[in-house]
Regions:
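HDAC/HDAC-like amidohydrolase catalytic core signature
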Residues: 1-228
Length: 228
């Protein structure tokens, strides 16, 4: 039986970087509060390796992020630093750890950020590497179903569905920036404050999960509704 009060959750203090937005600065606070409340058991991940990243991302892009050399090193956040680089490597390693824990326990989490806008050759929108596609790449024998709920659609993840046959993307997003639709990419746009439509789309996604019976479901939780 799954104990929902002690979910094993990937987190490292190196997730922190003093970014211009709270995107990476907030992560230690979230992890500490969740642990103090007894909801999670924090587990230290290993940073993702260059070889693993190059399975899904262009080598020149990966090297640019690792070294800080070239304009691509700034494409996600508009700046580069060593703690930013170390943070995104740890966060993506956390996604791999969370996937393994979920396959063992039935549920797991990663106190991370910044995956779904990252495409094979570049990042963007505060997303550097696509840790969702990375999980699918390293678990080729199972279908990985991404349920993405964010104001912006998972356009980077949708790009990866073209090249990873075991990756499925279902984006529930706002009416602005959205992902493309394809054989394994579904997009449902929700008008502002239309709670009923949002619930209808969520039920559609859950029904599809029941039909497809993927080996792993990843909930990509957007932070756009959060104010404070």
């Amino acid at each position: 039986m799954i104990d929902l009060h002690t979910v094993r959750t990937a987190f490292s203090e190196s997730y922190f970087s003093n970014t211009s937005t709270p995107s990476m600065r907030k992560l230690p606070l979230v992890a500490r509060q969740a642990a103090a409340a007894g909801f999670v058991k924090l587990v230290e991940p290993q940073p993702v390796g260059q070889a693993e990243l190059e399975q899904i991302h262009d080598r020149a892009y990966v090297e640019s992020i690792l070294t800080g050399i070239g304009p691509l090193s700034h494409c996600a956040f508009g700046y580069w630093s060593e703690d930013y680089r170390d943070g995104v490597l740890a966060i993506n390693g956390g996604n791999l750890l969370a996937a393994s824990l979920a396959l063992d326990d039935g549920i797991a989490a990663n106190v991370g950020q910044g995956f779904h806008h990252a495409a094979p050759r570049n990042g963007g929108g505060f997303c550097t590497f696509n840790g969702l596609a990375l999980v699918a790449s390293l678990h080729p024998d199972i279908e990985v179903f991404v349920l993405d709920c964010d104001e912006h659609g998972g356009d980077g993840t949708a790009e990866f569905t073209k090249i990873l046959p075991n990756l499925f993307n279902f984006s529930i997003c706002g009416t602005g920036m959205a992902a493309f639709e394809g054989n394994r990419s579904i997009v449902r746009r929700v008008p502002p404050r239309d709670e009923k439509q949002a619930h209808d789309y969520l039920n559609e996604a859950l029904a599809l999960i029941g039909e497809r019976r993927p080996g792993l479901v990843i909930y990509q939780a957007g932070m756009d509704p959060h104010i404070d």
